[in-house]
């Protein structure tokens, strides 16, 4: 199924009120329309505000082919997607300030189910992050990522590594079919609760040794689970 990115663009103007005028709003409209018409975006809402929060420009549009049944205006609700990472990290820092957890705490302190996490490597022993994104950097013909092997994780995974996306988690968009398929097979989004999600994650290999490399993925999702375990409260 084709995935459509729904983008909200909110720009805050820092100009003086006396000069916050949009002289040719049609030009701005045409920029929005370009991305709607070519199918790059399903919905777009653009809003410009002055220092006092007064709207000086607002325009929205949608692709009727992609989202025929959706309406869009200033009251439309949007998923914030990865912007939720900022919220999760902010909650973590609150817990650090309150002395509830430390950035160098091992993740296994709060999620002991992760004690036996394995790392996926190729038959030559290279972590699969070396092959991610289809880069194939310095990969020989007889050195392919699939099928991968599992090796012991001898690195300590820390809370800070989750924040920095250095803990070894990933999304099913690595371009490594055997790794993407096993993650998709877990259907993480269908987890009924945090404990079930943790159990599924504990059955997946890491793409690299914690602390070895930055790799964007489910790290902040795991951070949210750490927050819950450490505080005794749910993110909801």
Q: Where do the protein language model's features map onto the residues?
A:
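Hydrophobic (often cysteine-bearing) scaffold residues that line and stabilize catalytic clefts
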Residues: 24, 28, 80-84, 88, ...
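Short, conserved catalytic-motif segment at the N-terminal edge
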Residues: 22-78, 100-102, 116-123
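Sec-dependent N-terminal signal peptides
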Residues: 4-12
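Residue-level preference for non-acidic, small/hydrophobic
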Residues: 32, 46, 52-53, 85-88, ...
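Active-site-proximal loop and beta-strand segments within enzyme catalytic domains
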Residues: 63-215
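Active-site-proximal alpha-helical segments within enzyme catalytic domains
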Residues: 159-166, 219-229
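Bacterial peptidoglycan biogenesis and beta-lactam-recognition machinery
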Residues: 94-101, 227-236
């Amino acid at each position: 199924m084709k995935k459509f990115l729904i983008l909200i663009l909110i720009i805050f103007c820092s100009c003086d009120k006396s000069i916050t005028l949009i002289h040719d709003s049609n030009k701005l409209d045409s920029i929005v329309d370009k991305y709607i018409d070519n199918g790059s975006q399903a919905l777009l809402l653009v809003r410009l505000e002055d220092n006092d929060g007064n709207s000086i420009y607002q325009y929205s549009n949608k692709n009727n082919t992609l989202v025929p049944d959706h309406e869009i205006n200033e009251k439309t609700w949007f998923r914030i997607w990865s912007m939720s990472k900022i919220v999760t990290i902010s909650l973590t820092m609150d817990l650090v300030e309150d002395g509830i957890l430390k950035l160098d705490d091992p993740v296994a302190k709060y999620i002991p189910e992760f004690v036996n996490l394995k790392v996926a490597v190729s038959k030559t022993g290279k972590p699969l992050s070396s092959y991610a994104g289809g880069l194939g950097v310095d990969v020989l013909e007889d050195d392919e990522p699939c099928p991968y092997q599992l090796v012991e994780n001898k690195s300590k995974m820390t809370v800070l590594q989750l924040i920095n996306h250095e803990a070894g988690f990933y999304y099913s968009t690595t371009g490594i079919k055997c790794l993407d398929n096993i993650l998709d097979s877990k259907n993480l989004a269908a987890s009924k609760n945090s404990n079930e999600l943790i159990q599924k994650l504990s059955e997946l290999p890491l793409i690299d040794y914690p602390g070895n490399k930055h790799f964007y993925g489910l790290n902040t999702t795991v951070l949210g689970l750490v927050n819950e375990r450490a505080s005794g409260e749910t993110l909801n």
